[in-house]
């Protein structure tokens, strides 16, 4: 394959085909007198065409007719506002209108139809959507749009409203959004709001919405095994805060609620000193029985096997798992800006917001729960710019200071709260320069250079050292390895790999450094090896199922993933995962895009399931 695009590569996937016209022909297209071809009837000429513009143009013209009130055959009276429309358009978009206008209902024969229980502004927006396929959902209209979309059975609008509300979730409003979702039967939003409430319960319990909960919803929350609390004391304190917000009306529910607090899991000191001494608890016989049950559980450990039940079961909150991001790279002959996210729990790749620039040979690392994309090549220029991604907002920002040198095929890693950029090339030469970024100062500063120039280098952090592994010195691939000691600002050589590798993948897994794939002097590689820092030795592991140069390697939820690359003939979107116990690789699905020379990064899954980005998405405010 040679070096990555942007560094002199001319490699392309071998999937092009040469096509030509069938039948007999002569040079210049002239006919041949006496040819036997005249004995056969010529094939009829055909040209098949499907217009991509036609649907949009047709809708635009229909909307113009509506705006001018031409050929309209129905008027919707909504809250005193008259909205002109065409029955066929409304029926095609809405099952509600289809049933109204094509059945035997009285409205099917009326030219003016009154619609009740829908906000007139929401109806106007929904009718506009039927004609334009465009809508803006925002905080000021979502609470009227969603009920209207539910009534009119506009599923697409229901979904986008729910997605908008998911993005708005925070500890102060998640209970209100949950109730709203429940009222309008939005099951997915209800599920997400429940998960958010459980995970953020320690903040939710401080909100006014929590204090206003009806007793049934309070019970639903505190009985969950997945409630995320440091101890059961927090659950008891939350219940008592809720009770004391309106003691006169709520004290009758104390026993009903307290039975879902896992009193046997409290410390003896808290159970006796706080729960047992509370006047409201002591004044209720059923509550006293619950306290006595908890005391017996704590005082009689030999009897605990006979006392097991919901109140003795420890809570097991669902921890946010890790997700893998694939960033930029080279695809279909050009650098790309696209970014996608892999969730191992669902085995699903989803597009997220793209970078502002196309980047191949980009260095990627995670620092302070933010994903950094460093340098690369945009298909025309070498870059020194940096972008930073926040998974909570699904947005990239470009306010990060640039590196002092342009760099593509650069290695990037985090050590001691600094972001390091190692080697690469600047379009003139292969680099041994190393610099590090301080996020507090938003500033890059140079550190000691490597002893060897390296592009396509892999970097890893283990035991307080930064390792630079393989790459190319601009002439040939390397198997040498050196490591940086930040305490002495010095690079020292360690044992070399068994194989020369440039554009390899590298990751730390179970206290080993794994190096996989890449390219040697002749071909793309599937081989893999790992480094033991205790013995300063490299040892081989089983080869991957595919040759992969320009591959990304990352550890996600305790598993090692190899992502994308180039196999010598085609760019890859396949993924494989390594099992150290069986020493085997297995295929694990595909990305949406083929990627060579993209970066990979691993982060905790965001607390809210934000919008996934797509080119045809609805317009969203501030997105």
Curated annotation (Swiss-Prot):
Which residues are in the BTB domain? 72-139
Which InterPro entries does the record match to this protein? BACK, BTB-kelch_protein, BTB/POZ_dom, Gal_Oxase/kelch_b-propeller, Kelch-typ_b-propeller, Kelch_1, SKP1/BTB/POZ_sf
One protein family per Pfam: Kelch_1
Q: Where are the Kelch repeats?
A: 323-369, 371-417, 418-464, 466-511, 513-558, 559-605
Annotated ranges, domain BACK: 174-276
* Pathway connected to this protein: Protein modification; protein ubiquitination
- One function term, GO molecular function aspect: actin binding
Modified residues annotated as Phosphothreonine in this record:
19
Which residue windows are coiled coil? none
GO biological process, alphabetically ordered: negative regulation of synaptic assembly at neuromuscular junction; proteasome-mediated ubiquitin-dependent protein catabolic process; protein ubiquitination
Q: Which residues cross the membrane?
A: none
Sequence segments annotated as region (Disordered): 1-54
Gene Ontology cellular-component annotations: Cul3-RING ubiquitin ligase complex
Identify the CDD domains for this entry. Answer: BACK_KLHL20, BTB_POZ_KLHL20_KLEIP
List where Gly residues composition bias occurs.
20-32
List UniProt keywords, sorted A-Z: Actin-binding, Kelch repeat, Phosphoprotein, Repeat, Ubl conjugation pathway
What exactly does this protein do?
Probable substrate-specific adapter of an E3 ubiquitin-protein ligase complex which mediates the ubiquitination and subsequent proteasomal degradation of target proteins. May have a role in synapse differentiation and growth.
Q: What is this protein called?
A: Kelch-like protein diablo
- The species is Drosophila simulans (Fruit fly)
Q: Which gene is annotated as encoding this protein in its UniProt record?
A: dbo
């Amino acid at each position: 394959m040679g070096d990555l695009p942007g560094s002199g590569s001319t490699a392309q996937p071998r999937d092009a085909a040469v096509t030509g016209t069938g039948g007999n022909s002569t040079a210049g297209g002239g006919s041949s007198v006496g040819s036997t071809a005249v004995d056969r009837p010529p094939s009829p000429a055909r040209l098949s065409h499907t217009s991509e513009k036609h649907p949009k143009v047709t809708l635009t013209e229909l909307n113009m007719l509506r705006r001018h009130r031409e050929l309209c055959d129905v008027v919707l009276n909504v809250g005193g506002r008259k909205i002109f429309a065409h029955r066929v358009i409304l029926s095609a978009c809405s099952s509600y209108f289809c049933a109204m206008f094509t059945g035997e209902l009285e409205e099917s024969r009326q030219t003016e139809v009154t619609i009740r229980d829908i906000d007139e502004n929401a109806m106007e927006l929904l009718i506009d959507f039927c004609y334009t396929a465009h809508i803006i959902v925002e905080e000021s209209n979502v609470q009227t749009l969603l009920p209207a979309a539910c009534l009119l059975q506009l599923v697409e609008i229901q979904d986008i409203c729910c997605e908008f509300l998911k993005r708005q979730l925070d500890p102060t409003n998640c209970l209100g959004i949950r109730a709203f979702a429940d009222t309008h039967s939005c099951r997915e939003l209800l599920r997400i709001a429940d998960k958010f409430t459980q995970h953020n319960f320690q903040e939710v319990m401080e909100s006014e919405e929590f204090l206003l909960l009806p007793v049934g919803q309070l019970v639903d929350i505190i009985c969950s095994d997945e409630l995320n609390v440091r101890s059961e004391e927090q659950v008891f304190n939350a219940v008592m805060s809720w009770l004391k917000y309106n003691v006169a009306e709520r004290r009758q529910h104390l026993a009903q609620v307290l039975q879902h607090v896992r009193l046997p899991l409290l410390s003896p000191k808290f159970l006796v000193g706080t729960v047992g001494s509370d006047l409201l608890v002591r004044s209720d016989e059923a509550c006293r029985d619950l306290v006595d049950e908890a005391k017996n559980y704590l005082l009689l450990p030999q009897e605990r096997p006979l006392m097991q039940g919901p109140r003795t079961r420890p809570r097991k909150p669902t921890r946010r798992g890790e997700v893998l991001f694939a960033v930029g790279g080279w695809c279909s002959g050009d650098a790309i800006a696209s970014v996608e996210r892999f969730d191992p729990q669902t085995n699903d790749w989803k597009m997220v917001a793209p970078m502002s620039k196309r980047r191949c040979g980009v260095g990627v690392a995670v620092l302070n729960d933010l994903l950094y994309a460093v340098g690369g090549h945009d298909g025309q220029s070498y870059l020194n710019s940096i972008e930073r991604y926040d998974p909570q907002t699904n947005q990239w920002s470009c306010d990060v200071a640039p590196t002092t040198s342009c760099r593509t095929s650069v290695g990037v890693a985090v050590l001691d709260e600094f972001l390091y950029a190692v080697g690469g090339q600047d379009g003139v030469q292969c680099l041994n320069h190393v610099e590090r970024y301080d996020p507090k100062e938003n500033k890059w500063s140079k550190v000691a250079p490597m002893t060897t120039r390296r592009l396509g280098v892999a970097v890893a952090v283990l035991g307080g050292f930064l390792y630079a592994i393989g790459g190319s010195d601009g002439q040939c691939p390397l198997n040498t390895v050196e490591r940086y000691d930040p305490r002495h600002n010095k690079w020292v050589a360690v044992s070399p790999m068994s194989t020369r590798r440039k554009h390899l993948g590298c990751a730390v897994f179970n206290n080993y450094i794994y190096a996989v794939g890449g390219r040697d002097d002749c071909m793309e590689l599937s081989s893999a090896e790992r480094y033991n820092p205790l013995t300063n030795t490299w040892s081989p592991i089983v080869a991957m199922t595919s040759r992969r140069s320009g591959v990304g390697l990352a550890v996600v939820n305790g598993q090692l993933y190899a992502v994308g690359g180039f196999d010598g003939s085609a760019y890859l979107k396949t993924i494989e995962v390594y099992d150290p116990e069986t020493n085997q690789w297995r295929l694990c699905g595909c990305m949406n895009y083929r990627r060579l020379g993209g970066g990979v990064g691993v982060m905790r899954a965001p607390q809210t399931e934000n919008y996934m980005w797509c080119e045809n998405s609805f317009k969203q405010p501030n997105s």
